[in-house]
Amino acid sequence: MSSKTRFIAGLAAAAVFPAAVLGQTKPNATAAEVALYEGPDRLQKLVEGAKKEGGLAIYTSAQSDDMGMLVGAFEKKYGVRVSVWRSSSENVLQRAVTEARANRFTMDIAETNGPELESMHREKILQAVKSPYLADLIPQALRPHGEWVGTRLNVFTQAYNTKAVRKEDLPKRWEDLLDPKWKGKLGIEQEDSDWLAGVMGEIGEAKGTKLFKEIVAKNGISVRKGHTLLTQLVVSGEIPLALTVYNYKAEQLKRKGAPIDWFAIGTAIARPNGIGVARRAPHPHAAVLFYDFEISPEGQKILAGRDFVPTSKKVDTPLNKIPMKFVDARVALDEFQKWEKLYADLFTKGTK
């Protein structure tokens, strides 16, 4: 059992306790009072309050270059200094939970994967927000409890080295990976159990389990930790064909002239990444202001400019023009142990 499994499995499910909504925000208002305020002077109050607070702390799993573009634009627009702590999604979750249980509240914004944000919701770490920009988002970006929202999609696709693999030779079905020509050429990320759940939902669990066992037995598969690393190994040619690459990262490298391109076998699996305001945020005005900024057309265009797949219906991108099946963060969390075990059985046990 991985450390991620032990941590997520140990989180207690919790009910959501609605906070009272006051008619106006106060100078020392709580996150609930700020986040749920919908008056006509909402933006003015957020900006004035954020400047008085003087700072913002973001915990994120986004790459530094990607988050840096958002943060830089926000700081320039509002004059609020932002502190960013970056780590893996599981570390973001673990730090947020550990600090909350110790009554140490330093996080204003959590910006990470959907399942981790859903875990924070269950731990009562996040605060529901009523933002005017929520109406612009695709339905799959919204949660019934409103405590986090999808800002972009991590779309799992396949990527290949264009010098090592010809486009006409690309597999069109998962069964095509049984061809001996793929022996020693396949790679996969170490912890993509939510991707596996999505694929199994498309082709059937019994059929998919048998098929992937045969693929690994016949042609092998290289298992690597981290999607950025896996994508870079495709570029270097060490892994000619990777099965679980985020299409935005492949597109970023392709635009820079790297020998990489991406495609989808069947329906691409999409998982929302998102943002949540901490329930005990020390800088609530700045937190809600950044939340609004990231899901506004301005923030979403910045994400699209980094080749992310934004969730706003007002921002177009060529990266979402493929059929997609969405991972439900709640289901991914509830069934995490099942799919992680199957993923390990299929790919990580006895593989390199």
Where are these regions (language model features)?
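Short amphipathic alpha-helical coupling segments at ligand-binding clamshell hinges
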Residues: 70, 211-214, 282-294, 302-303
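Immediate post-signal peptide segment of exported/extracytoplasmic ligand-binding proteins
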Residues: 23-57, 75-76, 178-184
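A bilobed periplasmic-binding-protein/Venus flytrap-type ligand-binding module shared by bacterial periplasmic
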Residues: 157-164, 200-202, 271-286, 302-303
